[in-house]
């Protein structure tokens, strides 16, 4: 089980294909980056996760559960090893995540 409850909820939402739960764990102004470039969160998640059957298999976690190594797969790109880093706001919701291939 993942240590950080917000990160755990986000991973569960991704793996369930639950867009509503995914956005529910984010702050309204959440941001993200992919391979070092800021992206439009809504467009990116629609394309890479919810429109493509995205799935996260966790290899490891660090930084109190806010940094993950993940085997991420989707119908567009197949499977790749990725790093994910999360910033969690005081209200317990994710305000930013960064991902990229390792």
Residue ranges of predicted features:
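Short, solvent-exposed secondary-structure junction/capping segments
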Residues: 8-14, 23-39
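Terminal "cap-and-tail" regions of soluble proteins that handle hydrophobic small molecules
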Residues: 5-6, 12-13, 93-95
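Short, solvent-exposed aromatic-acidic interface loops
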Residues: 97-102
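Extracellular/lumenal ectodomain signal focusing on beta-strand-rich modules
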Residues: 29, 57-60, 96
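Surface-exposed, charged secondary-structure patches
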Residues: 42-90
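Generic helix N-cap/helix-start motif at coil->alpha-helix transitions
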Residues: 1-3
């Amino acid at each position: 089980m993942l240590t950080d409850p917000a990160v755990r909820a986000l991973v569960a939402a991704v793996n369930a294909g639950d867009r509503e739960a995914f956005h529910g764990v984010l702050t309204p102004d959440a941001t993200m980056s992919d391979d070092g470039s800021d992206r439009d969160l809504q467009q990116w998640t629609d394309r890479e996760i919810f429109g493509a059957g995205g799935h996260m298999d966790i290899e490891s976690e660090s930084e109190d559960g806010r940094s993950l190594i993940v085997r991420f797969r989707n119908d567009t790109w197949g499977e790749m090893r990725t790093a994910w880093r999360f910033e969690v706001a005081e209200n317990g919701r994710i305000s930013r995540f960064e991902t990229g291939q390792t």
